[in-house]
Design a protein with these regions (language model features):
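Helix-loop-beta substructure at the N-terminus of cytosolic sensory domains
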Residues: 2, 14-73, 84, 92, ...
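Allosteric cytosolic regulatory segments
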Residues: 3-9, 24, 161-172
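Signal-transducing alpha-helical linker
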Residues: 14, 18-22, 31, 35, ...
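Regulatory sensory and allosteric helical modules in signal-transduction proteins
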Residues: 71-73, 79-117, 121-124, 129
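Short hydrophobic beta-strand micro-motif common in sensory/regulatory domains
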Residues: 130-137
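Short beta-strand-to-loop transition segments that serve as allosteric relay/switch motifs
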Residues: 144-155, 169
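Signal-transducing coiled-coil/dimerization helices and immediately adjacent hinge/linker segments
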Residues: 180-256
Length: 256
């Protein structure tokens, strides 16, 4: 007799836990994703099939929380979407509890469990009877929780929870890498925006210095006064000055 529970369509637990194919598949999807959200949408069904196998009645969601960034959530169906947990919605549900405690949380039967009444009532309304939440920590770069819900009660016995956590751990490094790459991408965009803004302001200051025969400090003060009187950002006023002078918008050139 197999000592570990299984269900139709689910690969052998030990095969899943020992296979490096999950990491390779996640990396492939990361390489072909322009945005972090695109990657998570592609990663979610892959993680679901590798962890729980191919069968009906499974819905999954992934919630990513990062410092100073809005929560990012993806889901595989309406029931999972309805159960999304964010700090402002269901802040005390099984997913948030898993993140807070740093360990998996499971609900055997949403109709009889009394831990999260509001959240589980929504689950019951959508025909969901079992829940499993698996947390992942990315240090100071964020944390995420992968949640599964099914239409059958008691669908996640302890051995399945343990094997699911082990398989998810295989892909954790790629998920962390995706979060880190997105942070660098946002930083690059912010730097480009800042440099573009600086270019427009510097050009406008130079034009004002030439026209008014003033020094840099005086020209910038004039630019700020115009910004204040017109209730516009300094950059917008600077762009208008440059366009009026050169008949072209200012541009910043970046080396590839």
């Amino acid at each position: 007799m197999d000592p570990l529970p299984s269900f139709p369509g689910r690969p052998a637990i030990f095969d899943l836990a020992s296979s490096p194919a999950l990491t390779d598949a996640l990396i492939e999807k990361l390489l072909h994703s322009e945005r972090l959200e695109d990657f998570l949408h592609q990663a979610l069904p892959l993680l679901t099939s590798r962890i729980l196998g191919e069968r009906d009645g499974i819905h999954a969601s992934l919630l990513l929380l990062r410092p100073r960034r809005p929560a990012l959530a993806v889901s595989s169906g309406d029931p999972a979407k309805a159960l999304h947990e964010t700090p402002g919605r269901f802040p005390g549900g099984p997913g948030m509890t898993a993140l807070r405690e740093g360990s998996p949380v499971r609900v055997g039967d949403t109709r009889t469990d009394r831990r999260w009444p509001a959240h589980l009532a929504v689950a019951v309304d959508h025909g969901i009877h079992s829940l499993l939440a698996l947390p992942l920590e990315f240090g100071d770069e964020g944390q995420c929780v992968l949640s599964f819900c099914t239409t059958r009660p008691r669908d996640f016995p302890p051995a399945v929870v343990d094997s699911a956590a082990a398989v998810l751990d295989r892909g954790a490094s790629v998920l962390h890498l995706a979060v880190r790459l997105d942070r660098y991408r946002v930083l690059e965009q912010d730097l480009r925006t800042a440099m573009s803004t600086r270019t427009a302001i510097d050009l406008a200051v130079g034009i004002l210095m030439a026209q008014d025969r003033s020094d840099q400090t005086g020209a910038f003060a004039l630019l700020k006064r115009a910004s204040h009187y017109r209730n516009l950002p300094v950059r917008d006023v600077a762009v208008e000055i440059v366009e009026r002078f050169s008949q072209r918008s200012p541009s910043t050139h970046f080396d590839a």
